[in-house]
Curated annotation (Swiss-Prot):
Protein name as it appears in the record: D-alanine--D-alanyl carrier protein ligase
Family recorded in the similarity comment: Belongs to the ATP-dependent AMP-binding enzyme family. DltA subfamily.
PANTHER family per the UniProt record, alphabetical: ENZYME, PUTATIVE (JCVI)-RELATED, PTHR45398
Keywords carried by this UniProt record: ATP-binding, Cytoplasm, Ligase, Nucleotide-binding
InterPro entries to which the protein is assigned, alphabetical: AA_adenyl_dom (IPR010071), AMP-bd_C (IPR025110), AMP-bd_C_sf (IPR045851), AMP-binding_CS (IPR020845), AMP-dep_synth/lig_dom (IPR000873), ANL_N_sf (IPR042099), DltA (IPR010072), DltA-like (IPR044507)
Length: 504
């Protein structure tokens, strides 16, 4: 059964089942089908000979999901554009993508875009006037046609449009549902903005299994009282987020099985899952399964996964990121271009149907990052890692490795050991430059419970523990204490903001 057919069957079997909830707004599977059909019919009638991608603008409104499906039913890839994205970047996305149309479930604050804008009111008119009309199923996105395009940061300052095809998404969704043992009708957390591909991990596995997406927005996350009130009402069974977001939630004592009694599965992606975070989750949610996954946007969300058990936690201080999905494979490439043997570090290269067809309108960038290996698409991730007995271990970004006073080191390794210290709830390492070279390491720490009256005594205690785990040259010179670690709208640590704060 095709992906869209899998979603639409719930409009027949359970039409009144809620597909998506955001604050007081919700849509059923029946409404999702009717409105996305109406929109697809309108798009096809307005743009009969055009297949350019369509920008979908908003935050967590139910119209976002309707618009996504309406686009692909009409044969167009969609480009999710979150409200938090700066106007200049939205402008560059519009220009790079060649989009002619922007659908919005909210007010569009960006001006002078080179696209036709369909407002929230326009959309309601379309849903009403085209109700009951169905698009030609032959027009729907299929095969190696783009299903969605997500723009990620580019080293040149220009965003890169990662093209994910229908086949890429089908491969990911099938694997996620089967390997993570997702069941029919579950409630999925939707924490990541739609412009971040982690959101795909909950959207499509939920929709194909007749589940309910429970969306929480950035304003809720900024107000913990609202956040936990929403979570308490949700009855979430499948939790999808970055580890940083879960770590933030764990600072609330009531975040446990009593708040979410039916929690079945935690799915983590987008960042390293610290051992101590997984350990706390097992303590708070003893009946739930914790899955650690890995994958860049260019390989459709995730390509590896592992069930994190007590045994795994005790065996590995730095958690492995899992075994590769069966239709893909991993290669570890050495600097000379040869394949590294088991246990030897190198660059992680992903091969198989999960791999994107490249960056939209950027052939030079595509050629640099993508290649063909044995007739299959391959992506050079820029991530360091190694494989041992089929199990992938992630060792950070190759560009997260810094050289300090002649020593090469991984910032994430230092963060791992720092978080394991007593009196530390959360921590990020910020390398501070002097001129063109790194001068010292600053540790930004969210302290746990302690009885030290002075910060320097707390610092001494933490440093004493670090000295037992790390060589002296990896010990941060300075410590700064904060009540929380800033996060990006995507739920990752906002390293740029931290750097600007500490160097101001």
């Amino acid at each position: 059964m095709k992906l869209l057919e899998q979603i639409e069957k719930w409009a027949i079997e359970t039409p009144d089942q809620t597909a998506f909830v955001w604050r007081d707004a919700k849509i059923t599977y029946k409404q999702l089908k009717e409105d996305s059909d109406a929109l697809a019919h309108w798009i096809s009638s307005e743009y009969p000979d055009d297949r350019s991608p369509i920008m979908v603008y908003g935050h967590m409104q139910p119209e976002m999901i309707i618009n996504f499906l309406g686009c692909v039913k009409a044969g167009h890839a969609y480009i999710p554009v979150d409200l938090s994205i700066p106007a200049d970047r939205v402008q560059r996305i519009a220009e790079n993508s060649g989009a002619k149309l922007l659908l919005s479930g909210t007010e569009v604050t960006v001006t002078d875009l080179p696209v036709r804008i369909v407002s929230e009111d326009n959309l309601k008119d379309i849903f009403f006037t085209h109700k009951g009309k169905t698009p030609n199923p032959e027009h729907a996105v299929k095969g190696d046609e783009n299903f969605y395009i997500i723009y990620t940061s580019g080293s040149t300052g220009n965003p890169k449009g990662v093209q994910i095809t229908y086949n890429c998404l089908v491969s990911f969704t099938k694997w996620a549902v089967e390997d993570f043992n997702l069941q029919t009708g579950q409630v999925f957390l939707n924490q990541a903005p739609f412009s971040f591909d982690l959101s795909v991990m909950d959207i499509y596995p939920s929709l194909v299994t007749g589940g309910t997406l429970w969306a929480i927005d950035k304003d809720m996350i900024a107000r913990p009282k609202d956040l936990f009130a929403s979570l308490e009402q949700s009855d979430i069974q499948v939790w999808t987020s970055t580890p940083s977001f879960a770590e933030m939630c764990l600072m609330e004592a009531s975040f446990s099985e009593s708040m979410l009694p039916n929690m079945k599965t935690f799915l983590f992606c987008g960042e390293v899952l610290p051992n101590e975070v997984a350990r706390k989750l097992i303590e708070r949610f003893p009946k739930a399964t914790i899955m650690n996954t890995y994958g860049p946007t260019e390989a459709t969300v995730a390509v590896t996964g592992i069930h994190v058990t007590e045994e795994v936690l005790n065996q590995y201080k730095s958690l492995p990121v899992g075994y590769c999905k069966s239709d893909c494979r991993l290669l570890i490439m050495k600097e000379d271009g040869t394949i590294a043997p088991d246990g030897e570090k190198g660059e992680i290269v992903i091969v198989g149907p999960s791999v994107s067809v490249g960056y939209l309108g950027s052939p030079e960038l595509t050629e640099k990052a993508f290649t063909m290996i044995d007739g299959e698409r391959a992506y050079k991730t820029g991530d360091a890692g190694y494989v041992e007995n089929g199990l992938l271990f992630y060792n950070g970004r190759l560009d997260f490795q810094i050289k300090l006073h002649g020593y090469r080191m991984e910032l994430e390794e230092i963060e791992h050991h720092l978080r394991a210290c007593s009196y530390v709830e959360g921590a990020v390492i910020v390398p501070i430059k002097k001129g063109e070279k790194y001068d010292y390491l600053l540790a930004v720490v969210v302290p746990g419970e302690h009885s030290f009256e002075k910060e320097f005594k707390l610092t001494s205690a933490i440093k004493k523990e670090l000295n037992e785990r790390l060589p002296n040259y990896m010990i941060p010179r300075k410590f700064m204490y904060q009540s929380s670690i800033p996060m990006t709208p995507n739920g990752k640590v906002d390293r740029k903001k931290l750097l600007s704060e500490v160097t101001a």
